[in-house]
């Protein structure tokens, strides 16, 4: 079998070329992916918290991974309900968190690695939430570098982003690129595994659990539709004009600089140039010119997604 790096590189290339995946489920039989997944989970100490069955990663071995692979090979693997706990938020309220069993966490991390490798090259450059090498700081850098001359800012907060995800829509979106019914069934079963609260079983009719390793990448795949809508519909529809007309104040100071230069008054020209540096060259109120900017990001500490639109 190919090693994990080769498998993920092939998926990245297919994603970059927007080619469909037809045998993604077979990659779940690759032991090297489980070794990589176990290392990723082990590096995140919070991810080692046991789920409802009390299982931990301490007893992880190639033999145990082999048993998981055999169960997946014959579609006998059964995902367990997540253990629901509550953690405090800054507001004083409690946020529900789903803790999957350790085996489910391992399988979930392998699925996450495969999905991230394939979909990451296809995501919008305006998306900064739950992505490698991206976050709030890269979103702010984009705003600082690109959004000059902005007059209005509109901020939107998609509350309960993970909890409101529609399972059927999610699977349909995946099915557009992933032509592998076994893989899609596994994702559907993962979404519908339910949770235990006070040892009572509850169904999950919508959403993916906060605390699940696959939840961030699934939410990005889901919300990529919103990003593409903003890029292909909203931004072209709102865009008007090629360049702003010159700011009257900027033009006035520029004319004064020219006059001072003609009169040989270097000190006045130098002072006027310094003054002009604080004046926008373009007229921000030009009605024949407008642009719409869009960025989406997420708070890694509080799993919620935010949108910024500038005009």
PLM feature spans:
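Non-catalytic terminal/accessory segments
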Residues: 1-311
């Amino acid at each position: 079998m190919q090693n994990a790096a080769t498998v993920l590189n092939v998926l990245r290339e297919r994603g970059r070329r927007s080619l469909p995946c037809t045998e993604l489920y077979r990659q779940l039989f690759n032991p090297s992916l489980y070794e990589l997944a176990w290392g990723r989970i082990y590096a995140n100490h919070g991810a080692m918290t046991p789920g409802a069955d009390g299982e931990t990663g301490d007893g992880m071995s190639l033999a145990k991974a082999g048993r998981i692979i055999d169960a997946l090979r014959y579609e006998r693997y059964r995902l367990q309900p997540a253990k629901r706990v509550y953690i405090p938020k800054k507001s004083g309220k409690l946020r529900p968190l789903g803790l999957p069993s350790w085996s489910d966490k391992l399988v979930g991390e392998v699925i996450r690695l495969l999905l991230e490798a394939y979909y990451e090259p296809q995501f919008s450059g305006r998306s900064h939430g739950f992505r490698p090498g991206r976050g709030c700081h890269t979103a702010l850098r984009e705003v600082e570098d690109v959004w000059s001359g902005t007059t209005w800012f509109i901020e939107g907060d998609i509350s309960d982003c993970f909890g409101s995800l529609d399972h059927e829509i999610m699977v349909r979106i995946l099915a557009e690129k992933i032509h592998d019914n076994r893989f899609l069934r596994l994702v559907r079963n993962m979404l519908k595994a339910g949770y235990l609260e006070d040892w009572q079983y509850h169904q999950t009719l919508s959403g993916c659990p906060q605390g699940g390793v696959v939840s961030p990448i699934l939410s990005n795949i889901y919300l990529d539709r919103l990003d593409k809508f903003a890029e292909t519909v909203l931004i072209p529809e709102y865009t008007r004009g090629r360049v702003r007309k010159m700011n009257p104040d900027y033009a006035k100071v520029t004319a004064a600089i020219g006059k001072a230069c003609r009169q040989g008054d270097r000190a006045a020209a130098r002072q006027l140039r310094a003054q002009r540096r604080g004046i926008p060259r373009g007229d921000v109120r030009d009605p024949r010119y407008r642009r719409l900017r869009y960025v989406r990001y997420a708070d890694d500490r509080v799993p919620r997604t935010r949108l910024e639109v500038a005009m």
